[in-house]
Amino acid sequence: MAYKHLLAAFDVGGSKTDSVLFNERGEILARVKGEGGNPLERGIDNAAAHYAAILNKLFLEGTGDETAPIDVLYGAVAAKEYFGSGLEDRLSVLLPRVRRLRIEGDGCALISGMLGHRDGACMICGTGSSVYIRQGDDYCHIGGWGHLIDTCGSGYMLGRLAIRAACRAYDGRGEQTVLCDLLEKQCGEPIWEHFIELYRGERPYIATFAHTVFEARAMGDPVATAIFDEGARDLAEIAHAAARRLGKPFDLVLNGGIFTAFPEYARAVGALCPPRINIVYSDVPPIYGGAVEAMYEIGQICEGDFRATFLEGLG
């Protein structure tokens, strides 16, 4: 064996699960993706079984062995903080080959991907949204109360507001908008005739329509522009709350699928944040931050060579 350690990381969001097996040089041995697995939506037992199925496939693909030990497994899981040690307890039974396991909320990996394992904060904007703050071994979130309560500015919220605006235009209750045409282009029929599929697909499917807001805004559509502006303001409001809580300057990493796909949205949010916040626009995927945390578990800091090798391996 040309390496000393086998490490793994997985990242779970509302729409997808990403996992990698790698060594201490950053060489990726296997990568497996699956559908999202938020434990608030799936239930903790179903979620743990879902992660275990993906990870067992990852381990087998990367080692060719059903029992080869994995030195470290780090997980970044949306909504993990609501379940205490429940996920660790279940996965330690389902994945007996793992020697060391640590699972945190999905924000910590985003901080570490850009800042390393140190204090800071991140704003996630993907299917959902929230701000995570890490100070030493403690972390907390602001916002991110789930799509039933509060997921402001997120992909789900943007998609939902686009669909609502189109339905209001159809009813004659709202302003006419090009969103109607863009939504129909994606789903193949008027959005108001697509409700069986919308309710069947639920939150992840509705989030796939978020792109229509950015496309319509680029076309000068005032309805889409208002949705965009509302989302940016709401996300910046979370950053202001974080600034009040910390009471000092700090780094805020912006990451997540929506920010990555539509950097103009990230810039709009950043422009509305308090000046004491140093905005860091992420240029790495969340799974890289998970790798940084896995390496931290073996006392290693991810230097430039590791980063370059790992990111090149992701493709």
Regions found by a protein language model. Give the residues of each.
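Phosphate-binding/catalytic loop of phosphoryl-transfer enzymes
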Residues: 80-177, 311-315
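ATP-binding/phosphotransfer module of carbohydrate and carboxylate kinases, centering on a glycine-rich
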Residues: 1-64, 68-70, 91-93, 114-121, ...
